[in-house]
């Protein structure tokens, strides 16, 4: 069975992070429509020849064959478009952040349930190579009880042109929404969250630097982003009572896509970095292992959605995980940073 889908938006998100994976899954997905406000020259590319481009959203929403609508627009329009698609009887996938507010997310989930549909965020970075490798190390049990995880998503981009905006336009919403989701997918809802959210490069802009510390009993997960890191820093550091894991290097899918190397082509997402796992085994002997990176694949979002829509499989991101993530994001701006909040059980 092939599912017909449609996209709202035809910017970088759609063309770089979605279409290369969907178009590589012709046995399960067919892109029927793309809604955009104005025509673009890129539409003429042969790879898009089968897609109907339109500036009339009703053409998309009124097509009974479309079973999934993917919202890839600016964050402040996510809620409106997702709600319209659900009201039209479509399942919905929404780019990050899912919605600007927690209340809007709850409304979308309630609407989807009332119509027997699914609505979910595009948490493609659950399928980053670096995260999957760290996850494998954690789940191996070789580290024993995990006491600390540190996740970095850093750049060296010291100059920032003036672009004032809202909190959802900053790094905490833009990148933290992914890196915190990774932590939540592993450990669930934290007890407390400590925040340090700042704008360092241009004070007129939303935040570009943050550190969030998620506390789970004796476990602390640290999620950090900076645009002022010149020397490569580990992507993941994990400490347990029996050992440690460290992984340099970020997933290479985006690098390949920028170089016009597509999924399925030779060399796509090639990554020669390794993770290092060092632990004390049951015999008291220190063991050092190199872990080859797991294969990243953002298309697994669509594989999971296919199973949800066709077979009723549980959504790959739980509703509770989405709401926890958005609550953490939202509460980070309730008071001046640094700050600490306690989450309700």
Swiss-Prot record:
Keywords: Oxidoreductase. It comes from the Bacteria. The gene is yhhX. GO terms for cellular component: cytosol. Belongs to the Gfo/Idh/MocA family. Biliverdin reductase subfamily. It comes from Escherichia coli (strain K12). InterPro entries: Gfo/Idh/MocA-like_OxRdtase_C, Gfo/Idh/MocA-like_OxRdtase_N, Gfo/Idh/MocA_oxidoreduct, NAD(P)-bd_dom_sf. This is Uncharacterized oxidoreductase YhhX. The keyword DNA-binding does not apply. GO terms for molecular function: nucleotide binding; scyllo-inositol dehydrogenase (NADP+) activity. Its EC number is 1.-.-.-. GO terms for biological process: antibiotic biosynthetic process.
């Amino acid at each position: 069975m092939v599912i017909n889908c449609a996209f709202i938006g035809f910017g970088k998100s759609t063309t770089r992070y979605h279409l290369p994976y969907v178009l590589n899954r012709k046995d399960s997905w067919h892109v029927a429509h793309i809604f955009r406000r104005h025509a673009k020259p890129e539409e003429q590319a042969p790879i898009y020849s089968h897609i109907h481009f339109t500036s009339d959203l009703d053409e998309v929403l009124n097509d009974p064959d479309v079973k999934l609508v993917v919202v890839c627009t600016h964050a402040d329009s996510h809620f409106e478009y997702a709600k319209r698609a659900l009201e039209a009887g479509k399942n919905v996938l929404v780019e990050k952040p899912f919605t600007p507010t927690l209340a809007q997310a709850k409304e979308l989930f309630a609407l989807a349930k009332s119509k027997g549909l699914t609505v979910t965020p595009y948490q493609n970075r659950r399928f980053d190579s670096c995260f999957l490798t760290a996850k494998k190390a954690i789940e191996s049990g070789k580290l024993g009880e995990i006491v600390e995880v540190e996740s970095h998503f850093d750049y060296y981009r010291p100059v920032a042109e003036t672009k004032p905006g809202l909190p959802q336009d900053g790094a905490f919403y833009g990148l933290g929404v992914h890196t915190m989701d990774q932590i939540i997918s592993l450990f669930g809802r934290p007890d407390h969250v400590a925040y340090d959210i700042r704008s360092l490069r241009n004070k007129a802009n939303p935040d570009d630097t943050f550190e969030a510390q998620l506390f789970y009993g004796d476990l602390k997960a640290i999620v950090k982003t900076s645009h002022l890191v010149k020397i490569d820093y580990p992507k993941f550091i994990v400490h347990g009572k029996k050992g440690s894991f460290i992984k340099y290097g970020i997933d290479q899918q985006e690098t390949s896509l920028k170089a016009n190397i597509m999924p399925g082509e030779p060399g796509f997402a090639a990554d020669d970095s390794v993770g290092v796992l060092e632990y004390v085994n049951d015999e008291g002997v220190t063991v050092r292992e190199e872990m080859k990176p797991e294969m990243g694949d953002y298309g697994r979002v669509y594989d999971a959605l296919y199973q949800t829509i066709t077979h009723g499989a549980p959504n790959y991101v739980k509703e509770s995980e989405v709401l926890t993530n958005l609550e953490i994001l939202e509460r980070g701006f309730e008071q001046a940073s640094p700050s600490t909040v306690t989450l309700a059980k």
